[in-house]
């Protein structure tokens, strides 16, 4: 059975009775009309009153408010998702600001840690290494025939929480919920996948409730061959799918991206999505301060695949603004646990090599340290922008922030590590230490901060501003690849929707209530660039806009007609 996004067409449904009520994509619960109850053998299986979806959503909202902890709210919402997806997305849409942190970061981190404990019902595909010889059969078992977006993880680097084994499935489920909520992609077109390649988390291996393969992680050639077999099977089943890599370990994330980005329509959200939203935020923050990104000096704390991916996108944007690549690289400084990345450092990873600073150019620095700390770098570089992707809490100390503020009246500080327990500094501290003069954007949601009687909204530099629009743009345009230029177009479009840029004040990023508008705009920009680059069929702007509108799913019930299987 094919699901269509065409809103005014009736759906022809072969299921009836209790089977239909157990089908989350089709179940309406108490909203089935009397005619549908008669036609689909539902008479007597539901209470008498026929409700609207808004009446159902109001009851769900009242029930939601009865839960006291965020994890209990998460479990409740996931139960609705697994019972009635249309109602789930209507409820989320009605209370987006309240519920987005519950269905995704930061609450999803706890849900991943407790996945086997709170497990209720299967969702998505669990591909175990033990079943590596049955990949085609596994994918044929998926009821969604027209899958257009897949989010896949192997659970090894879940947020800042490390190896969660199959508990990492919470991330693809949550991520795809945002593709639908923010980007209008029908849930019938989405598929979460976790690769169960074992776990090195001893706590999970010892947990009698753990539901994954109790085995140390496979590695090296064995691992890469398995991933390749899975991707080839996905290509055979859904050749035009958009595949998003999510929360793979640093040692695997970049190699997998480089290996497959020109073989299948794919991207890594931790590397490219984080980079795109960060660059968009920095463009907006720079313009809000009356300058360009190319005029800034940028220091990173964290030089893993995500940090280096952001740095490379920043460098590309600086080059777009007129500097040479060499000049751009001299404005970006990467600090990891061993200090500033410099030439001659041992054990640098391949993606770090182009981001080192030359030791000979640091001879005038005011320091005697061999390993240059974050404080050394801030004191000597005098940066305008400080970005944290370290996954380690509290490393943006008062001394470091005050040192930065001493040389920069409006510092841009972005502690991006997730979840909130891993943030490099809280917005409250950053703004207090800078007398409210810092521009702050975080990776996790934070409430507004009050300093000296003035309230400051905190922009959440969340990838959900970017990846839903990219997904919608790829689907609407039929793009066969996700290129760097498409990602840069997404960044620029996000910056154009900044209240700070457009109004001269307010948050750096748009409000969540406007995220669907932003996603549509990003989809158009991404689709247009895809056409210009030849990775999508060229159409008129009007046709592309119509395709975006046609593919934008809304959580509304459709009329059902009965048919045979």
UniProtKB/Swiss-Prot annotation:
Reaction equations catalysed: (S)-malate + NAD(+) = pyruvate + CO2 + NADH; oxaloacetate + H(+) = pyruvate + CO2
Chain residues that bind NAD(+): 157, 270, 418
Residues engaged in binding a divalent metal cation: 246-247, 270
Domain of life: Bacteria
Cofactor: how and how many bound: Divalent metal cations. Prefers magnesium or manganese.
Requisite cofactors: Mg(2+); Mn(2+)
One Pfam family matching this protein: malic
InterPro entries: Aminoacid_DH-like_N_sf, Malic_enzyme_CS, Malic_N_dom, Malic_N_dom_sf, Malic_NAD-bd, Malic_OxRdtase, NAD(P)-bd_dom_sf, NAD_malic_enz_proteobac
Record-listed E.C. numbers: 1.1.1.38
Site feature Important for activity, where: 270
Keywords: Metal-binding, NAD, Oxidoreductase
A Gene Ontology biological process term: malate metabolic process
Entry GO terms, CC: cytosol
Active site: 104, 175
Keyword check for Signal: no
HAMAP family assigned: NAD_malic_enz
Family: Belongs to the malic enzymes family.
Subunit structure: Homotetramer.
NCBIfam families associated with the record: PRK13529.1
Record protein name field: NAD-dependent malic enzyme
């Amino acid at each position: 059975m094919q699901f269509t996004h065409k809103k005014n067409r009736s759906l022809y449904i072969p299921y009836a009775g209790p089977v239909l009520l157990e089908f989350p994509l089709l179940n309406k619960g108490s909203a089935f009309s009397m005619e549908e109850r008669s036609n689909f053998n539902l008479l007597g299986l539901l209470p008498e009153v026929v409700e609207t979806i808004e009446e159902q959503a109001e009851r769900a909202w009242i029930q939601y408010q009865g839960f006291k902890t965020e994890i209990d709210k998460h479990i409740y919402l996931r139960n609705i998702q697994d019972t009635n997806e249309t109602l789930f997305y209507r409820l989320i849409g009605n209370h987006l600001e309240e519920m987005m942190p519950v269905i995704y970061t930061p609450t999803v981190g706890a849900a991943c840690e407790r996945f086997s404990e709170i497990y209720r019902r299967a969702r998505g595909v669990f591909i175990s290494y033990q079943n590596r010889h049955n990949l085609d059969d596994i994918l044929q078992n998926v009821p969604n025939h027209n899958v257009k977006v897949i989010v896949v993880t192997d659970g090894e680097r879940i947020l800042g929480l490390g190896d969660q084994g199959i508990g990492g499935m919470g991330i693809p489920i949550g991520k795809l919920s945002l593709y639908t909520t923010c980007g209008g992609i029908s849930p019938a077109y989405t598929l979460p996948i976790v690769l169960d390649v074992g776990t090195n988390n001893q706590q999970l291996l010892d947990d009698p409730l753990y539901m994954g393969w109790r085995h140390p992680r496979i590695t090296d050639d064995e691992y890469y061959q398995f991933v390749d077999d899975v991707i080839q099977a996905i290509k055979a089943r859904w050749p035009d799918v958009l595949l998003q890599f999510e929360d793979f370990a640093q040692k695997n994330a970049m190699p997998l991206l480089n290996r497959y980005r020109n073989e299948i329509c794919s991207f890594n959200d931790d590397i490219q999505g984080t980079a795109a939203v960060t660059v968009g935020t920095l463009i907006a923050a720079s313009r809000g301060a009356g300058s360009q990104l190319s005029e800034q000096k940028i220091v990173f704390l964290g030089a893993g695949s995500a940090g280096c991916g952001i740095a490379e996108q920043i460098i590309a944007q600086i080059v777009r603004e007129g500097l040479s690549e060499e000049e751009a690289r001299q404005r970006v400084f990467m600090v990891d646990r061993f200090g500033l990345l410099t030439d001659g450092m041992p054990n640098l990873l391949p993606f770090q090599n182009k981001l080192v600073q030359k030791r000979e150019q640091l001879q005038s620095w005011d320091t005697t340290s061999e390993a240059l700390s974050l404080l050394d770098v801030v004191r000597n570089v005098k940066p305008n922008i400080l970005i944290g992707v370290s996954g380690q809490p509290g490393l943006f100390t008062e001394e470091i922030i005050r040192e930065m503020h001493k040389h920069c009246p409006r510092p841009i500080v972005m502690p991006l590590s997730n979840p909130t327990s891993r943030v490099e500094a809280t917005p409250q501290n950053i703004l207090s230490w800078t007398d409210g003069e810092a521009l702050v954007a975080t990776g996790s949601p934070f409430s507004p901060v009050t300093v000296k009687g003035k309230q400051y909204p905190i922009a959440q530099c969340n990838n959900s501003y970017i990846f839903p629009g990219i997904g919608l743009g790829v689907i609407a345009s039929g793009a066969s690849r996700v290129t760097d230029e498409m990602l840069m177009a997404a960044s620029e479009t996000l910056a154009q929707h900044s209240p700070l840029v457009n109004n001269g004040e307010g948050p750096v990023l748009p409000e969540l209530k406007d995220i669907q508008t932003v996603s549509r705009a990003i989809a158009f920009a991404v689709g247009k660039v895809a056409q210009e680059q030849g990775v999508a069929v060229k159409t008129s702007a009007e046709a592309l806009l119509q395709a975006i509108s046609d593919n934008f799913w809304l959580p509304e019930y459709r009329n059902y007609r009965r048919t045979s299987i």
